[in-house]
Amino acid sequence: MLSAFLLLVGCSGDKQEKNMSITVNLRYTGVNGNAKKFAEEMVSRGTVDAIRAEKGNLRYEYFQSLDDPETILLIDSWADQEAIDAHHATPMMNTIAELREKYDLHMTVERYTAVETPETENKFIRK
């Protein structure tokens, strides 16, 4: 089933995804609005801005599901695996883990590697 998502937090600005970038989709699920509270606290603490400023970060955006108010989608894109590894080595990962525990969130993770859009698909893309 295809879920619809509503943008919850502004985009990371003028960063563009490049070939071979890695995008990680994390779905946070909780109860009583905890997933949204988690995302809001990530923003209010400045953690989101700090992640967006990290070398190699291309995108860090939260979206709220239109058909499941207890789910928040994080789209997190990086230039390469080295950038992800550097991010995972930062102290802010402890902050993120503590917030996940605070809000009792459960996660599913999907990981994608960017490739060029085939020419045959360009006719379906409205720019």
Predicted regions and their residues:
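C-terminal motif of bacterial Sec signal peptides marking the signal peptidase cleavage site
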Residues: 8-10
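Short amphipathic alpha-helical segments
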Residues: 34-58, 92-96
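Sec-dependent signal peptide recognition
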Residues: 1-2
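Glycine-rich beta-strand-turn "strand-cap" elements at beta-sheet edges
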Residues: 14-19, 61-70, 95-127
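Short, well-ordered beta-strand segments in beta-rich or mixed alpha/beta enzyme
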Residues: 22-29, 59-92, 110
